[in-house]
Amino acid sequence: MKGGILIVILGILCWVPVATAQEKPRDAEKLGNVHFPVSCLPATQPQFDRAVAMLHSFWYPQGLNAFAEIAKTDPSCAMVYWGIAISRRANPMVGAPGAGPDALKDAVEAAGKARLAGAKTQRERDYIAAIETYYNDWEKRDYRTRVLAYEKAMEDVYLHYPEDPEAAVFYALAIDEAVNVLPPDPNFARQQKAGAILEKVLAANPEHPGALHYLIHAYDFPQLADRGLAAARQYGDVAPAAPHALHMPSHTYSMLGMWPESIKANQAALSVSKGYAHALDFMVYAYLQMAQDIEAKRGVDRNIELLKSQGAAGAAAANPTGAVLAGYTALAAIPARYAIERGAWTEAAGLQPVHSTPVADSITYFARAMGSARSGNLDAARKNIEQLKQIEEGLLQVKDDYWAQQVEIQRNAAIAWTAYAEGKKDAATKLMRTAADLEDGSEKHVAMENRLWPMRELLGDLLLEVNEPGLALKEYEASLQLARNRYRGFYGAAKAAQRSGDPGKARIYYDKLVVLCSKADTQRPELAEAKKYLAQK
């Protein structure tokens, strides 16, 4: 992009790799290539570009502080107050309820200052009016209404200034945000629209951090993830100063089952943001898929230390993007994944809830219910199912329909496996299929990017248990289309093929499992079984 400047933070930062804890020097840090022209003091322009670059990588509160510093030296710069206002929005990808009352009040004040400061160009006045559209009457208008109004306002800015790449990038982000408040679209029309806009920006400026970041979000769905791979491979190198830029590529890597790449990305993120539980969750999940249980356990232990040293609220708040819910869910998901992925049912049954948020607690109660049902403690399973029911009802009362449905899915699955343990096979398979169908009809949330347990895979597990290997194979293969390169998916598909009389397909899936776990640090029984099968002539 002509006229752009390369945003560089001077200085050398030592980083701590997760596994070795040895310090190594990082290169001079960058935030990407951003140029957002403003009619302010000449000295303000590079500072403003730097602050916008931080904003594009969701680097809170550093970006907010950067705008605030500009306001001290150039208080007549209207757009700096726009920057403060938009930075107060909270992470736009997390969804409802959005920013809290205090942040909203501060944002309204900043937007008002932006308007009263008298922006010198119509373009600047249009940006300010757009963000005011988001905040106006926030006490009376719900989050969804404000998000959609802002999307329309940014569309108008984008159409009025077709040569302004920042208008394009912020409009694409508004589209991405609107996806979270609308029903799932099987055609992904909005996501593809945002992606097309961002791809055009990247063609002119390949190192624009916002275009790279929001493109990954636009394609952050299993059906689209391949299209975000090029951006994922580039983003961390373009803006390594921002912890989220180092982590964000792992969204794509997880969707595609690229576990070594996910681990590398999250090691980098954790090296600069050591309390980043969301990144730690991704890393533990990736290790578990490759049967690197010793490495995964280190992540579990690190999670325990985060909780001990900071408490749930402090550890969740350490998320550098401000996505506190993603922190809470990560803290609960890490030990749950460690038990479930290893089939350690008694361990899963004994997990203790952190009692942070209902959404996070539901993860623990679901794992406890499944662990109890699979280990034969049906009374405990029923008690945990009741806890899930109470959480679901509470979420419905506050009109949090999305998360209420996610808990409903968990509850149906837990009831299904409890019913199976009671000998009610037909009821069990019916309920489990309901859970799988419900999950297929909903989208994953960035606060739980890697779903704890793909329900269609879990349906395959149940069908194997009730001696329907042919049907089980169909479900495993369907699950692997969306949850790629999963250890339990490959093993289940291999076992189902073997038991349904398809040795060729069984060999294919056992081989995939062995290749996936070529660097395993633990000899899991399923892996030993796969190697034994493949050794047969």
Say what each PLM segment does.
Residues 4-16:
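Bacterial N-terminal signal peptides
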Residues 22-77, 81-163, 170-207, 212-226, ...:
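Short coil/linker segments at helix-helix boundaries
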Residues 56, 90, 177, 221, ...:
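Register position in tetratricopeptide repeats
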Residues 78, 85, 89, 99-116, ...:
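TPR/TPR-like (Sel1-like) alpha-helical repeat modules
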Residues 373-376, 405-436, 453-469, 479, ...:
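C-terminal substrate/ligand-recognition segments
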